[in-house]
Amino acid sequence: MSSYLDFEKSIKQIDDDIANARIKGDEHAVEILNKNLEKEVAKVYKNLNEYQRLQLARHPDRPYAIDYIRSFLMDAYEIHGDRAFRDDPAIVCYVGYIGGKKAMVIGEQKGRGTKNKLRRNFGMPHPEGYRKALRVAKLAEKFNLPILFLIDTPGAYPGVGAEERGQSEAIARNLFEFANLKVPTIAVVIGEGGSGGALAIGVADKLAMMKNSVFSVISPEGCAAILWNDPSKQEQATKAMKITADDLKNLKLIDDVIKEPINGAHRDKDGAAKELASYFVSKLEKLEKLSIDELVAKRIDKILSVGAYEE
């Protein structure tokens, strides 16, 4: 069953009308309603504000890392465990082929349904998850495989156990190691990019965001609670924080914005997967033309340029 946001009510009404027309076997009505749906979808999604894009980034029907992996990674084989503590299901690692190119895919996975969300810890990795990501990244480096990182997390897990096992060290270690990997790396925010939890798999040669994704140092609710002592002012905070893909592209904090189908990734998962796979293949072709020394040097220069400003 599809989920609808407040600003999608008009779309829901037409979807319901189409379903009823199909039950009645009225194909003529279905044809007319589908045309109306196309117009309404274009109208609704044409001028989304920042808060609406945040809602889409968190949409329960939005494709997660495994959805994309199943869509475009051929001959996929999952790799488990950090070889030190346990396997963290909030981080998924696969090797396979994207557009005929062998690659490693490392992603954050939120999970669907109560049991799966609990198993995946709502997409909040423990330190062993980030260490698993590092182990697999080093494996990719050993076999000269490019890496695609799929970022989608509300943040790294802040629990006592995670802190005791070195959450901050695990994140910091990944930042250092990923900056120096001797293979092409591409990171894409596919939903939520929550602070250090996102950065831990976000250091790459190319950092992109899906059109309706967000990337921030704190959630808008958390920001509103701190600044105004009122979490309900999240819409105001969302606008002020500049967390959308277009905002971050304008601030030169990301390299590219990957377009989504006109009706959003949550309504056209296959279309979104094609856009993401196409982006990876096209950028990889350019990165593979660089020598390893050039690749790492450009990556380091890019990292050091973050935060620079002009008076």
From Swiss-Prot:
Self-association and partners: Acetyl-CoA carboxylase is a heterohexamer composed of biotin carboxyl carrier protein (AccB), biotin carboxylase (AccC) and two subunits each of ACCase subunit alpha (AccA) and ACCase subunit beta (AccD).
> What Enzyme Commission number(s) does the record list for this chain?
2.1.3.15
Domain CoA carboxyltransferase C-terminal intervals? 36-286
Q: Which family does it belong to?
A: Belongs to the AccA family.
The compartments listed are: Cytoplasm
Metabolic or biological pathway, per its Swiss-Prot or TrEMBL entry: Lipid metabolism; malonyl-CoA biosynthesis; malonyl-CoA from acetyl-CoA: step 1/1
Molecular functions (GO terms): acetyl-CoA carboxylase activity; ATP binding; carboxyl- or carbamoyltransferase activity
Give the classification, highest ranks.
Answer: Bacteria, Pseudomonadati, Campylobacterota, Epsilonproteobacteria, Campylobacterales
Quick one: where is this thing mainly located? cytoplasm
Q: What does this protein do?
A: Component of the acetyl coenzyme A carboxylase (ACC) complex. First, biotin carboxylase catalyzes the carboxylation of biotin on its carrier protein (BCCP) and then the CO(2) group is transferred by the carboxyltransferase to acetyl-CoA to form malonyl-CoA.
| Protein name per UniProt | Acetyl-coenzyme A carboxylase carboxyl transferase subunit alpha
**A Pfam entry, by short name:** ACCA
Organism equals: Campylobacter curvus (strain 525.92)
Q: Which GO terms describe its cellular component?
A: acetyl-CoA carboxylase complex
Gene Ontology BP annotations: fatty acid biosynthetic process; malonyl-CoA biosynthetic process
